[in-house]
Amino acid sequence: MNFTSLLQDGIYEVGNGAIVTDQSPYLGITPDYQGAYGFPTHPWGIFFQVVGAILVFGAYLPAVIKVLISKRTENLAIGMWIISIAGLGLLAIFAWLGVSVNPGGFILVALSETLSCIASIIVFALKIANKAKAKAAGMTELEYCNLHYPIVKKLPKR
């Protein structure tokens, strides 16, 4: 018995026992699904991927929309956005590596993490720009935002 026949059989004989390399029959994994569609292929796996991707991206939308409309960033913590961008960037890289290894798998997660990271970068860039403009004007960020982006409240009609 030579080495290549051992690899082709999927069973290595070691002493009195055997090491099984092809465990798909024992784990209930259907190899044709994995080859055709990628991972995860179980309906619950796809459901959780879709819902998770929507929730992750949807969590950033309200903050991004609010900042883009009001241009006010004085209440945003720089550290939180730096950590958020770093985490989302690493998760996006991980997800895209999963997509490259297994086409079809993790594509929604990869898109969600990438879009969330881009949205976070936009908000962070606005925060840094406002902070730099305020410093150049010799003001605090709050004073700068109050001067250039006043909060306009509609008064009730009499």
UniProtKB/Swiss-Prot annotation:
GO CC terms: plasma membrane
**Where does the chain cross the membrane?**
45-65, 76-96, 106-126
The record's annotation in Gene3D superfamilies points to: 1.20.1280.290
Organism superkingdom = Bacteria
Q: Where in the cell is it found?
A: Cell membrane
Keyword annotations from UniProtKB, A to Z: Cell membrane, Membrane, Transmembrane, Transmembrane helix
> Membrane topology for this entry?
Multi-pass membrane protein
Nucleus listed as a keyword? no
Q: What family is reported?
A: To U.parvum UU007, UU041 and UU042.
Name of the protein in its database record:
Uncharacterized protein UU008
